[in-house]
UniProtKB/Swiss-Prot annotation:
GO terms for cellular component: cytoplasm. NCBIfam families: PRK11783.1 (NF008748). One of its GO terms (molecular function) is RNA binding. It holds the Pfam family RlmL_1st. Its EC number is 2.1.1.173, 2.1.1.264. Gene3D superfamilies: 3.30.2130.30, RNA methyltransferase domain (HRMD) like, Vaccinia Virus protein VP39. PROSITE patterns: THUMP, UPF0020. It catalyses: guanosine(2445) in 23S rRNA + S-adenosyl-L-methionine = N(2)-methylguanosine(2445) in 23S rRNA + S-adenosyl-L-homocysteine + H(+); guanosine(2069) in 23S rRNA + S-adenosyl-L-methionine = N(2)-methylguanosine(2069) in 23S rRNA + S-adenosyl-L-homocysteine + H(+). It comes from Francisella tularensis subsp. novicida (strain U112). InterPro entries: 23SrRNA_methyltr_KL, DNA_methylase_N6_adenine_CS, RlmKL-like_Mtase, RlmKL-like_Mtase_CS, RlmL_1st, SAM-dep_methyl-trfase, SAM-dependent_MTases_sf, THUMP_dom. The keyword RNA-binding applies. This is Ribosomal RNA large subunit methyltransferase K/L.
Length: 718
C-alpha cells in the first residue's frame, strides 16, 4: 500500500495527547507545533478522520520549498502535478496559514496559487477547475513559515472538531476537541476501565464535556456525529475503503454502564444541554439536573472523576465576580467534605477562582480555548488536599526565615540597626519620644525605612531601581523583616510593611482593607491614633514633629488654620496649648480620625472647626482671619473632589497667596512640603518676609535625610 506523509493539526497544547491517540490507533507519529506528523497509508489517515477526538485537520503533504518572491511562488506551485491529485471537473479552495518573510498579503498568496493551478490545468486540458469557497471537493492548504511554503491537500473538508450535536450553546462554548482533550488529560480513559466509571460536571453549561465523555464511554467515532462531514474528492480517495471503515466504526459502538451526570444552576442552559445530549444520541448515559455547585452531594457508591469548565471570571461575570469567587469557595468545601478519593479537573483562565477552592493542585497543564490561554488544574481529594489558608503574617514569617539562608548581606543591616539605636538612645531618653525613624536606606542594598512606634515597627520598602533585580530586592526586604524581629526583639505580628512609591489613580490615599486596627501613641504631651495596616500612611508624619511644635507654640491661646490637615495632629498640639483651631481637608475619613484624636486628648470638638473641602476652593471664599496658618499640601494630588490637579511646584504661589489672604497682618504662615526639588517662587520671596527653617524643623532621627521636607516661615512685610 502506497505510503504518504501526513500532518494532523490540533489546538496548541494537546500535541502529545494527539500523538498518544494515534498510538492507540496503531499509528506512530512525531510531535510538531500544533499537530503531529506521520508516515502511513490512506487507510491510516482515514482512521484518524474517523476516530480522532482531538484532531482538527488531516492533511496529505504535497510539497515544501523555499520561496523568496512571487515568481518563485508561481513556479513552485506550477511544479506540482496537480492532475495527479484531482480532476479538472472537481472544485477546490485555498486556505493560507502562518507568516512569510516576503509576503504580507495572504490574499495575494492565495491568488497566485490559484493562478498557477488553473494555468496548469488549462495548458494541458484546455479546461480549468472552478473555485468553490462554500462546498469544495478539495481543500489545498498553504502553510507559510519564514521563507518556506508547505503545501497540503486536506482529507477532511471541514474541521474534525465539529460534531453537529451542538445545536444549542451557552455564552462561552468549549470546543468539542478541547473538551475531549481535558477529559483524556484528567484520566477519563483510565476511569473507563473501572467496573462502573463515574463522571460529574458540576457546571456543565450546554453539556459538551458530558457528551464527549459519553462518546468515549460508548466508543462512538466522532465523525459519525458530523452530519455535514465531507471527505476529499481526490484521485487518492478510496471510496470503498472509506465506506468499509465507516461501517466498522458504526458496528464498534458498545453499551456502557458509565454514570455521567451534569449539574448547573441555570435552567435555560440545562435545557440546551438536554437538547444537545439527545442530538448526540447519548441520553441513555447522560443525565442533567439543576443544582448549585455549593450544594453538590456525593450520592455515588464509588469514587469517580469530576471535570468542569466554569465561566472565566470577569469575561462572563463582570460585576458578579464576588459571587463567582464565593461559588468556588463553596465548591472547594464540598469536595474536601464529601468527595474523598475522587479526582478533580478544572479548566479555567481565572486563577483567583482556583485559589478560592483552597485545595492543593497535583498537576497543571496549559491549553488554548481558541485564543484564550487556559490552565487545567487537577486535584486528588485526600487528607492532604485541603490547603490551609496562609495569612499574610504567616507568609512573611515563612519567607523571612528562609531568606536569611540565601546570603549574608542582612548581617550588615542588623549591625546598622544596632548602631543607629545606640546613637539615638540619649536623645530618646531626653525627649521621651517613643515614635521615631531608626533607619532610612542607610545601606543602599537595603532600601527601606524603619519607623519605631513603641512596640510596633512600620517598615516601608522604597521602590527598587530598575537596574536592581526584583527578586534580590524582595529577598532583602524579607531579610530586613527577619533582622528587625531578631535584633530589635519585635514580634513578627508587630512588623507592618508597606511599599513606598508614587501611587497612581485609584491607588492614592484609599483604604486597603477593612481591618480598622488603631493603636495609641504618645508625642510629647499629646496622644494620637495610628493605623499600620489599613491606609497608605499611619496617621502621623514623624518628620513633621518639630514643625508641629513650632505651630503649636506660635498658636498658643490664638487662632489656627490647619490646611490639608490630614488627621489634625498639628491642630491637637495647638489646641492643647489653648488655640482655637480650624482644620480643612478633602477627606472626611481623615477629619473623623482627627476628631477622634481631639477626643482622645479630652478636647471638646465643639469648640473647634472641622471642614471637609478642597482647600484652594475654600480659601477663595473664606472671610475669616487667623493668627497662625499651617499649610502642608501634598506634592501632587488628583483627587476627584478637587476642581483641578494639584502640583506643588506649579501651584505653591497660588496657595501661599490665598493662605496669606486669610492671615492676620501680624500673623505667621508655616508652609511645608516634601518635594525634594522644590524652589520657592521669586514673586513670593519678593512679596513677603520668607525664612527657610528646614534646619530648625529637622529632628535628630532625620538628620541622614536632610532634604526630606521644605519648611518656611512667612510673614507680611512691615
Amino acid at each position: 500500500m502506497q505510503k504518504f506523509t501526513f500532518f494532523v493539526s490540533c489546538a496548541k497544547g494537546i500535541e502529545l495527547l494527539l500523538k498518544d491517540e494515534l498510538e492507540r490507533l496503531g499509528i506512530s507519529s512525531q510531535e510538531k507545533l500544533a499537530g503531529v506528523e506521520f508516515e502511513g497509508s490512506i487507510k491510516d489517515a482515514y482512521k484518524v478522520c474517523i476516530y480522532s477526538y482531538l484532531a482538527s485537520q488531516v492533511m496529505l503533504k504535497v510539497a515544501t520549498d523555499k520561496v523568496i518572491n512571487q515568481q518563485d511562488l508561481y513556479e513552485f506551485i506550477s511544479s506540482i502535478n496537480w492532475m495527479d491529485y484531482f480532476a479538472v471537473d472537481k472544485t477546490f479552495k485555498i486556505i493560507i496559514s502562518g507568516k512569510h518573510y516576503d509576503f504580507n498579503n495572504t490574499m495575494f498568496v492565495s491568488q497566485k496559487t490559484k493562478d498557477a493551478i488553473v494555468d496548469q490545468f488549462r495548458n494541458v486540458t484546455n479546461q480549468r477547475p472552478n473555485i468553490d469557497t462554500e462546498n469544495p471537493d478539495n481543500v489545498i492548504k498553504l502553510h507559510l513559515h519564514k521563507q518556506f511554503v508547505n503545501v497540503f491537500l486536506c482529507l477532511n473538508i471541514d474541521s474534525l472538531h465539529k460534531r453537529s450535536y451542538r445545536q444549542f450553546q451557552g455564552q462561552a462554548p468549549l470546543k468539542e476537541s478541547l473538551a475531549a482533550a481535558i477529559l483524556i488529560k484528567a484520566g477519563w480513559l483510565e476511569e473507563l476501565k473501572k467496573h462502573q466509571p463515574i463522571l460529574i460536571d458540576p457546571m456543565c453549561g450546554s453539556g459538551t464535556i458530558l457528551i464527549e465523555a459519553a462518546l468515549m464511554a460508548k466508543n462512538i467515532a466522532p465523525v459519525l456525529l458530523n452530519k455535514e462531514f465531507k471527505i476529499f474528492n481526490s484521485k487518492f480517495h478510496n471510496k470503498e475503503l472509506w465506506d468499509n471503515l465507516l461501517e466498522i466504526a458504526k458496528n464498534s459502538q458498545k453499551v456502557t454502564n458509565a454514570i455521567i451526570c451534569g449539574f448547573d444552576i441555570d435552567n435555560n442552559v440545562l435545557d440546551k444541554a438536554q437538547r444537545n445530549i439527545y442530538q448526540a444520541g447519548v441520553e441513555d448515559v447522560v443525565t442533567v439536573k439543576r443544582q448549585d455547585i455549593r450544594d453538590l452531594e456525593n450520592e455515588f457508591e464509588s469514587e469517580g472523576l469530576i471535570v468542569t469548565n466554569p465561566p472565566y471570571g470577569e469575561r462572563l461575570y463582570g460585576d458578579q465576580l464576588d459571587e463567582l469567587l464565593d461559588i468556588f469557595n463553596g465548591f472547594g468545601d464540598r469536595l474536601s467534605q464529601d468527595f474523598y478519593g475522587w479526582k478533580v479537573a478544572v479548566l479555567t483562565s481565572f486563577a483567583d477562582s482556583i485559589k478560592e477552592m483552597q485545595l492543593r493542585t497535583t498537576k497543571r497543564n496549559k491549553f488554548y480555548n481558541g485564543a484564550i490561554e487556559t490552565i487545567l488544574y487537577q486535584f486528588e481529594i485526600n487528607e492532604h488536599a485541603k490547603f490551609k489558608h496562609e495569612t499574610q503574617l504567616e507568609k512573611n514569617i515563612r519567607i523571612a526565615e528562609a531568606s536569611v539562608q540565601k546570603s549574608d548581606e542582612h548581617i550588615d543591616f542588623a549591625n546598622k540597626l544596632k548602631k543607629n539605636l545606640k546613637s539615638l538612645k540619649p536623645w530618646l531618653k531626653q525627649t521621651g519620644l517613643e515614635c521615631y525613624r531608626l533607619y532610612d536606606a542607610d545601606i543602599p542594598t537595603f532600601a527601606v525605612a524603619v519607623d519605631v512606634y513603641g512596640e510596633h515597627i512600620f517598615l516601608q520598602e522604597y521602590r527598587a531601581d530598575a537596574t536592581i533585580d526584583q527578586n534580590i530586592a524582595k529577598q532583602r526586604f524579607y531579610q530586613a523583616i527577619y533582622q528587625i524581629h531578631k535584633t530589635l526583639d519585635i514580634k513578627y505580628e508587630n512588623i507592618h510593611t508597606r511599599v513606598r512609591q508614587r501611587q497612581k489613580g485609584k491607588e492614592q490615599y484609599q483604604k486597603e482593607n477593612d481591618k480598622n486596627k488603631f493603636h495609641i501613641i504618645n508625642e510629647f504631651d499629646a496622644k494620637f491614633y495610628v493605623n499600620f495596616d489599613d491606609y497608605l500612611d499611619t496617621g502621623i508624619f514623624l518628620d513633621h514633629r518639630k514643625i508641629r511644635q513650632l505651630v503649636a507654640k506660635a498658636a498658643k491661646n490664638k487662632t489656627l488654620l490647619n490646611l490639608f490637615s490630614y488627621t489634625c495632629t498639628a491642630s491637637v498640639h495647638a489646641a492643647l496649648k489653648g488655640a482655637k483651631t480650624t482644620s480643612v481637608d478633602m477627606s472626611n475619613t481623615y477629619l473623623e480620625w482627627g476628631k477622634n484624636n481631639f477626643e482622645l486628648n479630652k478636647l471638646d470638638i465643639k469648640k473647634h472647626s472641622f471642614i471637609q473641602a478642597d482647600c484652594i476652593s475654600w480659601l477663595k471664599t473664606n472671610k475669616d482671619k487667623f493668627d497662625v496658618i499651617f499649610l502642608d499640601p501634598p506634592t501632587f494630588s488628583n483627587s476627584k473632589r478637587m476642581d483641578d490637579i494639584l502640583d506643588i511646584q506649579r501651584d505653591h504661589e497660588l496657595l501661599i497667596n490665598l493662605a496669606m489672604d486669610s492671615l492676620k497682618k501680624d500673623g505667621i504662615l508655616y508652609f511645608s512640603n516634601n518635594y525634594r526639588r522644590f524652589k520657592m517662587s521669586p514673586q513670593i520671596l519678593e512679596k513677603f518676609n520668607c525664612e527657610n527653617i528646614d534646619k530648625i524643623c529637622l529632628s535628630r532621627d532625620f538628620l541622614s535625610n536632610k532634604n526630606i521636607h521644605n519648611c518656611w516661615e512667612i510673614k507680611y512685610k512691615k
